[in-house]
Amino acid sequence: MVFGWRKAFCTSVSSNQDKPQQHSSLHTTDPPIPTPRFRSKFGFLSNPSTPRLRSRGGSGTGCRSSASTSVTIPSLPTSPKLHCRTTSNATPRTSNSSSPKFFSNPSSPKSSSSSSSQGGGGVSLLRATLLLNKSNSSRCAICLQRVNSNQSNSTAAIFTAECSHSFHLSCVNGLEDKRCPFCSAAWNHAPKSNYPAVNNNFGSDPIRRPEIREIKTGKSLRVYNDDEPLAYSPVSLAQINTIHESDENDDVEDDDDFPGFFRDSSITSDMVPSISGNLEVKLLPESAVVETGKKKETHVVIMKLKASPSPSSITDAIKARRPSIDLVTVLDLSNGGANLQTVKHAMRSVISLLREMDRLSIVVFSTGSKRLMPLRRMTAKGRRSARRMVDALGGMETTGGVGMSVNDALKKAVKVVEDRREKNPSTSIFVLSDGQDQPEAVLKAKLNATRIPFVVSTTRFSRPEIPVHSVYIASPGALLHAPLRDAFTERIASLLNVTLHNVKLNLSLVNGSHLTEISSVYSLTGRLENFGSGSVIQVGDLFAEEEREFLVELKVPTSSSGSHQVMSVQSSIVDQMTHQPMTCPKEKRFLIPRPQSVRYVSSSIERLRNLHSMCRAVADSRRLIEREDLSGAYQVLTTARSNASHSDDSLRSLEVELNELSRIKPRNSILNRTEDKPEQLTPTSAWRAAEKLAKVAIMRKHLNRVSDMHGLENARF
């Protein structure tokens, strides 16, 4: 039944269509095309070869369909009649049209009954082609960027060809064949090559150029994560004790202790107490009363720590076993001549002290700052490249702006340490300069105290806890003499070695009233820190001859304010060989000097009071910042700054805290603004607010009803 119906339906087509079909497939020629441009635009309407199901040699069961159909589009009255050709074989024919392939009608075995759907598809394809031509007219066919002559910010010249297509003039100049890339029409009036050809990768896009310029001129520091990976040298077999195979018949077990991996270990347990005792603690002779109350007074005194140099035998042993270090050197090239040669001599000494597992980076500054070398291991190749780079340094005479360059160079040095991918156990930053940025009186006092032509001062960046050693070489030819050069090398070597690891101090009061207590301890070196009312102070690592200052605050009863107080200090360190905590056996006791009254005025006492007010202000501001009270923290810091003297060092610390607060405040205000932003007044928001108010009113009414009935449960209504 099914096959008979299909045969009857398919053979009902008029047989007159076979003759035109055969005639058109054998003798039909293409109509003349007016212009190549029209063919390129409407060539997509030629239906590609669609395989049709047709009868073979009088077979009665095949379905025959017309092979040639003409498509008439009423929306294009001036267009010529388009013919759709279909070959008799099932192999599709490739269209030579220049239109895009994704706009061509895909070949599908459809019958002639779907002509209406094909007509709708032709209209949609025509619409898509018109949109394509419209978008192509606003783009350059060479660089594929937009061509908008109406934009005011567009500075690229535009060339409009005879075929009404627009291009960038710089892109057209690079063409060898003067033909339109869209329609292949020849140009009679070709543009003159007055402008150099521009790289087509970027073109003349007015949107891209500001982004590239912004990246080039940005002031943000780059990411310095190109450090050389750590590769420790293999341990020599001579330093490892070989384990001999025991005899199977030998039943006697040796009771000898394990000698350790290093046979020639020069550090013994007898040296540990001397290492732990190399910490000098002293109290300054001035003490001041900063606050007086009805029951208690507040006294302050400064405690100073210093890591004294170790004996030569222990120092050599520590150098042999010291951990590897990541060192960033900051070199001052602002003054040429003899000062530059001195900096080069100092840098060569630093390079000679580094071992193969250490890494070195070089940053220089003059009128600007630049990183010359990333963190590189000091192998033989690394030493040669570092020395070659130091020898090629050149100085520049500058008159001003060096201070800002020093700050930028230090920021880059800290960025090198922070962005490194791999880390050595120890990290340091060396600043080698002639000390011109230091006050002359301070530099002379330090030189007279040490009697050597260079001064070393150590500070710390407390955010990443990086020690910064500033080496000021006052005399230009100081390192030309052998004794001074040896002293400088020994001093630099002591800075590379951490003398005391993880130092802790335990403070307590021996005599006096039980109401006397140590209320707070403030660190004055580096970033200010408050250790609170606890008696344990975390000092950290100390280099050789490094000094730390702490401000100790005492709460003393008013009745015993005139009596002397005794403070005991007990220190503990971590041994760098065994990594075990060790306590110094000797407890040090100090007599706290009698404080001066509030009315007493002197420069040292005034400095103590300013330091105390500054430390209290910084501690209070940080406490308020933790509570997100930025306005209160700003008010506390500004009040302390107005009360501080301009010649005091505490003013600099207050300025640092204010700058940090100013960076936090805009970010927090933006967050609060986004969180507390009121909802825009719309009918929906008004309806939502009315619903909330209605719910609140219903809840209140319900609560009022419950309160009215309260106590009437047993009223026997």
From Swiss-Prot:
It holds the Pfam family zf-RING_11. InterPro entries: CLCR, VWF_A, vWFA_dom_sf, Znf_RING, Znf_RING/FYVE/PHD. Residues 13-28, 85-94 have a biased composition (Polar residues). One of its GO terms (molecular function) is transferase activity. Disulfide bonds: none annotated. Expressed in root tips, cotyledons, leaf primordia and hypocotyls. Residues 13-120 are annotated as: Disordered. SMART domains: RING, VWA. Keywords: Metal-binding, Transferase, Ubl conjugation pathway, Zinc, Zinc-finger. It catalyses: S-ubiquitinyl-[E2 ubiquitin-conjugating enzyme]-L-cysteine + [acceptor protein]-L-lysine = [E2 ubiquitin-conjugating enzyme]-L-cysteine + N(6)-ubiquitinyl-[acceptor protein]-L-lysine. Residues 95-117 have a biased composition (Low complexity). SUPFAM superfamilies: RING/U-box (SSF57850), vWA-like (SSF53300). Probable E3 ubiquitin-protein ligase involved in the regulation of root growth. Acts as a positive regulator of root gravitropism. This is Probable E3 ubiquitin-protein ligase WAVH2. It comes from Arabidopsis thaliana (Mouse-ear cress). The lineage of its organism: Eukaryota, Viridiplantae, Streptophyta, Embryophyta, Tracheophyta.
